[in-house]
Design a protein with these regions (language model features):
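Basic, amphipathic "hinge/linker" alpha-helix immediately C-terminal to the N-terminal HTH DNA-binding motif
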Residues: 100-119
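N-terminal helix-turn-helix DNA-binding core of bacterial DNA-binding proteins
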Residues: 32-76
Length: 134
């Protein structure tokens, strides 16, 4: 069995010695949503790295760059964009297109630095995963 007083959120600071499949399943269920969120952040910032664009194009760019392996969920995209704007990583402007207002997003200098850091961190993480899986 495993220590039950420590929540799974503190798993990074705790060494676990699983004795059954329950722990592995619980760890996977707590890690995968964070992994997907991290991939979504990387996909959105990467889509904005080349040019200013709007939400639908961000989703298309992520889909195109991953050859259809990853899609940015619309329900996750706009809250994430608002968060990135609040954090100063992305700027937003509005423009009227065919009678409707459209929000265009672009990376700030701070956003470019964050993207560079994320790319470096993800490359290191992928190296570890490849070593473990390969």
């Amino acid at each position: 069995m495993y220590h039950t007083r420590t929540s799974l959120r503190t798993i990074q600071r705790t060494v676990w010695l699983p004795t059954d499949d329950t722990l592995v399943y619980n760890v996977s269920m707590s890690v995968l949503p964070k992994f997907n969120r991290g991939v979504t952040v990387l996909a959105v910032l990467s889509a904005l790295d080349r040019r200013e664009t709007y939400g639908y194009e961000i989703r298309r760019e992520a889909f195109r760059r991953t050859k259809g392996l990853f899609t940015v969920n619309e329900g996750a995209l706009y809250p994430l964009l608002h968060s990135l704007v609040r954090r100063g990583l992305v700027r937003v402007r509005q423009q009227k297109v065919r009678g409707r207002w459209r929000k265009y997003y672009r990376l700030t200098e701070r956003g470019r630095k964050e993207l560079s850091t994320l790319r470096h961190d993800w490359k290191n993480s992928l190296g570890v995963l490849n070593a473990l899986l390969g």
